[in-house]
């Protein structure tokens, strides 16, 4: 192949990839999050409604500026805020979400990570998080280093291809960077601030956690699958 043609072709594919990503991220009303937890909420009640459930969560910060129907991430799951009160909000959780995520194990008193969806003025401090759980992982271990913690999370094989060393992953809705990776687990380094303002410190070895891989990895995979059509 002509060496002068190859770079041009490569740049063309990169340009199409950038346009594709931009289109996907901005194409609809789907809410987005950054993985920067704003507040630790507390589950007030869980009411079973057939195969679904309604949860009421005590909160303060995420209620500010939130209207009926707005989206709030609860442990990394995008939920619609309903019945907003001065110090709480409710949300309905579908059967599928109860089965796919850890929300099915919530009970009164459980601490949860909360984040409002982004606005045009929001700073993207973490990475793009959709609030769509890809899999449930398991907390395998926590190493306390005094001023930091190393958390080890086991994950199912179906999401392994989306995880890369130094890449992003959302754990319980928290934007984290993969500091260590094997075929069966990854490790993340936790700073004191994150330990303080999230539910990680309340989890025990063996607990299930919600995992969401970086959506950009999914778009790359899809682009490669559809490359002949773009």
Q: For the regions a protein language model found, what residue spans apply to each?
A:
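Conserved loop->alpha-helix
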Residues: 25-230
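Short polybasic linear motifs
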Residues: 18
């Amino acid at each position: 192949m002509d060496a002068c043609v190859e770079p041009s072709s490569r740049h063309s594919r990169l340009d199409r990839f950038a346009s594709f990503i931009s289109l996907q991220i901005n194409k609809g009303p789907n809410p987005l999050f950054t993985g920067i937890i704003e507040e630790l909420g507390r589950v007030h009640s869980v009411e079973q409604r057939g195969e679904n459930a309604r949860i009421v969560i005590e909160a303060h910060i995420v209620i500010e500026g939130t209207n009926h129907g707005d989206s709030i991430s609860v442990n990394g799951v995008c939920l619609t805020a309903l019945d907003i009160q001065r110090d709480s909000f409710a949300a309905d959780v579908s059967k599928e979400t109860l089965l796919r995520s850890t929300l099915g194990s919530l009970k009164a008193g459980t601490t949860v990570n909360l984040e409002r969806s982004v606005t045009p003025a929001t700073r993207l401090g973490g990475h793009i998080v959709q609030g769509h759980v890809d899999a449930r992982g398991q907390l395998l271990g926590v190493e306390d280093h005094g001023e930091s913690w190393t958390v080890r999370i086991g994950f199912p094989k179906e999401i392994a291809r989306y995880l890369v060393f130094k890449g992003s992953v959302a754990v319980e809705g928290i934007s984290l960077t993969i500091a260590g990776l094997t075929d069966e687990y990854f490790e993340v380094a936790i700073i004191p601030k994150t330990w303080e303002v999230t539910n990680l410190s309340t989890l025990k070895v063996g607990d299930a956690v919600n995992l969401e891989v970086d959506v950009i990895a999914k778009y790359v995979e899809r682009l490669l699958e559809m490359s002949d059509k773009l």
